[in-house]
Regions:
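Short glycine-rich, Thr/Ser-proximal phosphate-binding strand/loop in the N-terminal lobe
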Residues: 60-103
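Gly/Thr-rich phosphate-binding beta-strand-loop-beta motif of the actin/hexokinase/Hsp70
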Residues: 37-78, 209-221
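Nucleotide/phosphate-binding catalytic cleft detector across ATP-hydrolyzing
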Residues: 1-48, 53, 102-132, 137-211
Length: 221
């Protein structure tokens, strides 16, 4: 609510952003029921990233027109630290014990996302995105945030958090001035990537029974 006056003032002062009846148009970014950002142009871009254990996929999306502007997929830069989540948790745990310099796994994925974003922006001729939406399995999300993953790898498999997060992308080491939204997870081994799949499939509108299968490096059904 507090953001609405500035949004309306900016929209009306831009001219041409309205329907002639006092209504304004634009793009609003919601966090729950809170308006946390807005754009009054007819273009609003987002970087959508799925951090897979093996592959990182990124889409540059024109959210106003609802189409993909550019896409890129790369081998996960954390792969030298292990091909599976348990190996990477082991490396991260060893780093936690000694704390010799920056967290290498966190740095690897942050630098990779930054490079992918820069390449997509250059390809599309855009300066920056309006926001980033980041998803992945629970271990990948922990490694992105620099959170300890030790307890994901052993019973009773307790993550540091499964909550959604909103924070500046720069706080994650990603080269962007935009906010980053991290989708919530469900459990230690049912992550935000599954939540994204359920949302994309409109599972909440589907009649039971409903089957979702994710055949990634780590498969879930």
């Amino acid at each position: 609510l507090a953001a609405l006056p500035a949004f309306i003032r900016k929209a009306r002062s831009n001219g041409g952003c309205g329907d002639g009846h006092g209504n304004v148009c634009g793009f609003g970014l919601m966090h729950g029921e809170t308006l946390v950002g807005y754009a009054t142009s007819d273009e609003a871009y987002a970087l959508i990233v799925d951090i897979g254990t093996t592959t990182v996929a990124a889409l540059l999306v024109d959210t106003a027109r609802r189409h993909v502007v550019a896409a890129r997929g790369e081998h996960n830069a954390q792969s030298p630290y292990g091909a599976d989540v348990i190996s990477r948790i082991r490396h991260e745990t060893e780093w936690e014990e000694h704390r010799n310099g920056p967290n290498p796994l966190q740095q690897a994925i942050a630098k990779q996302i930054s490079a992918m974003l820069a390449g997509l922006l250059e390809q599309a001729g855009i300066g920056d995105v309006d926001f980033l939406s980041l998803t992945g399995n629970t271990t990948m999300m922990h490694l992105l945030c620099g959170l300890p993953g030790e307890h994901i790898g052993k019973a009773p498999f307790i993550p540091a958090t499964l909550e959604p997060m909103r924070l500046p992308a720069a706080d994650l080491g990603i080269a962007s001035q935009a906010p980053a939204f991290l989708l919530p997870g469900i459990s230690a081994y049912i992550g935000a990537d599954i939540v994204a799949s359920l949302l994309a499939a409109d599972a909440h509108r589907s009649q039971p029974p409903f089957l979702l299968v994710d055949l990634g490096t780590n498969a879930e059904t």
